[in-house]
Curated annotation (Swiss-Prot):
This is Major outer membrane porin. The keyword Membrane applies. It comes from Chlamydia pneumoniae (Chlamydophila pneumoniae). Pfam families: Chlam_OMP (PF01308). Residues 1-23 form the signal peptide. The lineage of its organism: Bacteria, Pseudomonadati, Chlamydiota, Chlamydiia, Chlamydiales.
Amino acid sequence: MKKLLKSALLSAAFAGSVGSLQALPVGNPSDPSLLIDGTIWEGAAGDPCDPCATWCDAISLRAGFYGDYVFDRILKVDAPKTFSMGAKPTGSAAANYTTAVDRPNPAYNKHLHDAEWFTNAGFIALNIWDRFDVFCTLGASNGYIRGNSTAFNLVGLFGVKGTTVNANELPNVSLSNGVVELYTDTSFSWSVGARGALWECGCATLGAEFQYAQSKPKVEELNVICNVSQFSVNKPKGYKGVAFPLPTDAGVATATGTKSATINYHEWQVGASLSYRLNSLVPYIGVQWSRATFDADNIRIAQPKLPTAVLNLTAWNPSLLGNATALSTTDSFSDFMQIVSCQINKFKSRKACGVTVGATLVDADKWSLTAEARLINERAAHVSGQFRF
C-alpha cells in the first residue's frame, strides 16, 4: 500500500510538472507539521492531552514569501440577458435613434480569451500543536484581462440623421469584430486562511484548507482594437450607474462626473489534499473548489473625442461608405461611428473545481520550499518559502 501511494503521488507531481500549469494555492497538507524546530527558538512538541502542557508549547510562528502566478483563469461574463440601447438600424437611410429598446445582450455568459493575475506577498502563519495553521498574506497584485469586444459591450452610433449628434441619441450597433484588453496597476492585496492536518498514518497526511483573498486595483490601461473604432486610454475614467445616453461631454478630456475604473477582485476557496513524506521531499496532490469575481461596477468608458468637430470628425474613426459613392452632405455624421463606448462587466469563474499537484522540500525541519501547479479551472503556478521562528 505504501509503495502504491508513493507511486501515485510521484506520478501526479511529474504530470503536473510537464503539463500546462493551472485560484488560490491549496498548499501542502503536511505544512503545519513539517517544521518542528525553530530557527530562533527550539521547537517544543506539545501533547494537547498532557495536563502539564502550556500554550507556549502549543503555539509557534512561521513566516516567508508567497508568490502566486495565474497565467489563464477560466472566466465568463456575469451580465443580464438583455441590454438597453437604440434600435437596430434597418435599410440604407439615415435616422435618429432616441428611443431605448431592450435587445439580447451579446455579453451574456460570454467567455473571456485570457485572464492573468500575479501576486507577490509576505506570509505569516500561527501554528497550533503542529497540526493547524491560521495564516495571512500581505502583498501586491496586478492583472490582465482580454476578450472579444462583445464581452465588454462595445457599442456605437452609426447612420445618424442630421448635421449634429443630439444629446438624446443612443448607440444602435454592437461591435463584435474587435478585442478589448485591460491592464491593472499593482495594488495592495491580502488573504486569510486556515489549514489543518486532519489525519495521519505513517508518512501519509490528509488535510483540508480554506482561504479568502481580496484586492482592488485600478485599471492602468484600456485598449480597444476594432476596425471601425480603435482607441487606447491610460488610467481610464468612466460612468457608473449611468444609463444611455451618456453625457454629451463623454470622452472629452474635461468631462465631469466620471470615476476611476477600479476592479474589485475577491476569491474564496476550499480544498483537500493528500501528501506522503519521502525523507526531505513531501509530494502532494489535491482538489479545490473556488469562486473568483472581478467587479468594476459596470463602469462605462467612452472613446476619447474632440470637444467640437474638426473636418466633420469628432474621433479618429474611419468612414464607412458601403455601396455609396460619395459622402453625405446632409447627414454629416452618418458614415462613421459616433459615441463609441465599452463597459467593464462583472466577470466570474466559469469552472469551479480544479486539481493541484506540488511538492515541498524540507531542510533541517526549520526551512521549507514549496512549488505547486494548478489545473482545469485555471493554469497557475505557486512558489513559497518559509521558516519557523
